[in-house]
Each structure stands twice: as C-alpha cells, then as structure tokens.
Amino acid sequence: MKAQNVRDLDEHELKTKLKEMDEQMFRLHFQMSMGQMDGLKKVRQMRKDRARMNTILRERELAGEKK
C-alpha cells in the first residue's frame, strides 16, 4: 500500500486496517511455523505496510499536539 493511499484514510479506517493486518500477520506466522508457507515476501511487505500506517498515525498525533 502506497503512503499516499494510507494518508487518504481517516484515523478510524487506519486503526481498523491495522487490526486486520495484525490478524493476518498472526495467521501467516502460524502458517510459516507449520511449514505450509515458504515465501517471506508477503510477510515483509505486510510488516512494511503496518509500519507505514503506524508512522502516519503518529504524524497525525504529533501534528494535533502542535496545534
């Protein structure tokens, strides 16, 4: 997910997507531990997307404090 697409979402949508990603990450890690999935690419991309969302949420939080 591109940063601009993430910035277009409101705070509630971002938090909802983060919860969904957490659940997906848990399932993917479980599948990897069971040997059902080999590729790390999807896990890495999800981790980067999650970090991007957290960063944008934090930016908004800090911008709100400055005002």
UniProtKB/Swiss-Prot annotation:
SUPFAM superfamilies: Ribosomal protein L29 (L29p) (SSF46561). The keyword Ribosomal protein applies. InterPro entries: Ribosomal_uL29 (IPR001854), Ribosomal_uL29_sf (IPR036049). Keywords: Ribonucleoprotein, Ribosomal protein. One of its GO terms (molecular function) is structural constituent of ribosome. GO terms for biological process: translation. Pfam families: Ribosomal_L29. The keyword Ribonucleoprotein applies. One of its GO terms (cellular component) is ribonucleoprotein complex. NCBIfam families: L29. Transmembrane segments: none annotated. Belongs to the universal ribosomal protein uL29 family. This is Large ribosomal subunit protein uL29.
